[in-house]
UniProtKB/Swiss-Prot annotation:
Protein name: Chaperonin GroEL 2
Quaternary structure annotation from Swiss-Prot or TrEMBL: Forms a cylinder of 14 subunits composed of two heptameric rings stacked back-to-back. Interacts with the co-chaperonin GroES.
A cellular component annotation (GO) from this entry: cytoplasm
UniProt cross-references to HAMAP family, sorted A to Z: CH60
CDD domains, sorted: GroEL
């Protein structure tokens, strides 16, 4: 494919236009009075969202160079989201301000490399300052963090705090859609473990990059599955039942994985494969625990059981399964409470008998996973659009609360960043030249979140910043009052703020040092119907898997598994 090249100031200017296009769409959502953004969908009603990462991922610009700038900011949002679960809008606002200041100084003749070094030194001091100001989460702080992160929704804050109280701060909490208008929370049996899907083609929700099944069947085995022939009987039975299927095994690979992926892609069978947690004997124990939880049978080599003899009666059942790239959560049906209790009692007896500290640790983990349960927050709303928006807010609030438990909290509303900006004066005084300018770039940019929060609330951002500096108080954008935000419960998770600063500095400093941009040259679209080809003709070759020697699959409408 031919390439387009752009150099020097022209290249940086095009990147900045892309950065601004995306950041301007995202920044309106920050703060308790942030606005919503409407996203057009190819099918169905548009989405109305207040989530920075969702907005960023939906933006694609026509100009290839500007689009690269937008993609860089998308990376800021997604990296912050992946590591902290929240803070994407703050990171975007910071990155935009740093890019603007950095490119302005570069155009004036500053050394991009020295600017970058100064920015990195400033970021290191800000991170240290956050750590020194951070306070551990205790008491009502959990509810306060959740409330602030959900844009002031006290019901959400109370519900998340209650969920963490019921299943512990390290417990499993999931968010799902309710069949009613009310938002409610319940605790049910379930389990989560650190294993994700074996292939990204199993994803059912492309926006969130997760695979979700309602009322799935679960095949449990400690075997490695390489060929599909052993799975044919159970796959036929599951396909006829109409239920989704989750396969938990030592590993699904090769021909078996390719066949499952193809039939999932064709819509023939809703299926996903996940590697079982742990290793060796502990893997077998974990699979046995899941079998008890779901009412299934573990197809084990130790008992000379084979996959070709599996029936629907051997499969486990769950209310819901959510699989991400790195983890799997199973929400059980509560139909096997007695069996789970007996299993926990048996593990406790094993715990009493062991003298190994390592074994004790692993046994306690198994007990916690089995007995801890899963807190399920069911989100209700009057319309589907409102439901999606509310669900995103609750997920963000939950992620921010977990981050707060991990690294503590600082005063919110951008007030901590404003204080840390003042502290950079001493660092700037120690440096000279363009490194000092790099520190000043970060210093000025740290005021951007406060400025935007105030602007979204209908106040003059410059006036608010100056008043905060003179009074030493934070600005409550919800009430318009200057007060001690930590004392009034307006707090941010330290981890979220830290990652927002680090990711923003990382991308901005790289962009400032960019000299050449290379993009793909857009190819003209061919006229409709050109060449007289069938637009779906490319699918015809998928019938060629008939050579696998499984003619019995043809009768169930699964030609790809023949």
């Amino acid at each position: 494919m031919a390439k387009l090249l752009s150099f020097s100031d022209e290249s940086r200017s095009s990147l900045e236009r892309g950065v601004n296009a995306l950041a301007n769409a995202v920044r309106v959502t920050i703060g308790p009075k942030g606005r919503n953004v409407v996203l057009e969908k190819k099918f169905g009603a548009p989405d109305i969202v207040n989530d920075g990462d969702t907005i960023a991922r939906d933006i694609e610009l026509e100009d290839p160079f500007e689009n690269l700038g937008a993609k860089l900011i998308q990376q800021v949002a997604s990296r912050t989201k992946d590591k902290a679960g929240d803070g994407t809008t703050t990171a975007t606002v910071l990155a935009q301000a740093m890019v603007r200041e950095g490119l302005r100084n570069t155009a004036a003749g500053a050394s991009p490399v020295e600017l970058r070094r100064g920015m990195e030194k400033a970021a290191a001091q800000v991170v240290a300052g956050l750590a020194s100001r951070s306070q551990a989460v205790e008491g009502d702080s959990i509810q306060q963090v959740a409330t602030v992160s959900s844009s002031g929704d006290e019901e959400v804050g109370r519900m998340i705090a209650e969920a963490m109280d019921r299943v512990s701060v390290d417990g499993v909490i999931t968010v799902e859609e309710s069949k009613s208008l009310a938002t409610e929370m319940e605790v049910t049996e379930g389990m989560a473990f650190d294993r994700g899907y074996s292939s990204p083609y199993f994803v059912t929700d492309a926006d969130r990059q997760v695979c979700e099944f309602e009322n799935p069947l679960i095949l449990l085995t400690d075997r490695k599955i390489s060929t599909v022939i052993d799975l044919v009987p159970v796959l036929e039975a599951v396909q006829k039942s109409g239920s989704p299927l989750l396969i938990l095994s030592e590993e699904v690979e090769g021909e078996a994985l390719a066949t499952l992926v193809m039939n999932k892609s064709r819509g023939v069978l809703q299926v996903a494969a996940v590697r079982a947690p742990s290793f060796g004997d502990r893997r077998k124990a974990a699979l046995a625990d899941i079998a008890i939880l779901t009412g299934g049978t573990l197809i084990s080599e130790d008992q000379a059981m084979t996959l070709d003899k599996v029936t629907l009666e051997d499969l486990g059942h769950a209310r819901r399964v959510t699989i991400s790239k790195e983890s799997t959560t199973i929400v059980a049906n509560d139909n096997h409470s007695e069996a789970v209790s007996n299993r926990v009692a048996a593990i406790k007896r094993e715990l009493d008998a062991t003298e190994s500290d390592y074994d004790r640790e692993k046994l306690n983990e198994r007990i916690a996973k089995l007995a801890g349960g899963v807190a399920v927050i069911k989100v209700g709303a009057a319309t589907e659009t409102e439901l999606k928006n509310r669900k995103l807010r609750i997920e963000d609030a939950l992620n921010a609360t977990r981050a707060a438990v991990e690294e503590g909290i600082v005063a919110g509303g951008g007030s901590t960043l404003l204080q840390l900006a003042e502290d950079l004066n001493a660092l700037a005084a120690q440096l000279d030249g363009d490194q000092r300018t790099g520190v000043e770039i970060v210093q000025r940019s740290l005021t951007a979140p406060v400025h935007q929060i105030a602007t979204n609330a209908g106040h003059n951002g410059d006036v608010v910043i100056e008043t905060m500096r003179q009074s030493g108080q934070g600005f409550n954008a919800l009430t318009g009052v200057y007060e001690d935000l930590m004392a009034t419960g307006i707090v941010d998770a330290t981890k979220v703020v830290r990652l927002a600063v680090q990711d923003a500095v990382s991308i901005a400093s790289l962009l400032v040092t960019t000299e050449v941009v290379i993009a793909d040259k857009p190819e003209p679209e061919p006229p409709a119907g050109a060449g007289g080809e069938d637009p779906m003709g490319g699918m015809g070759g998928m019938g060629g898997m008939g050579g696998m020697g499984m003619p019995g699959m043809g009768g169930m409408g699964m030609p790809g598994m023949m």
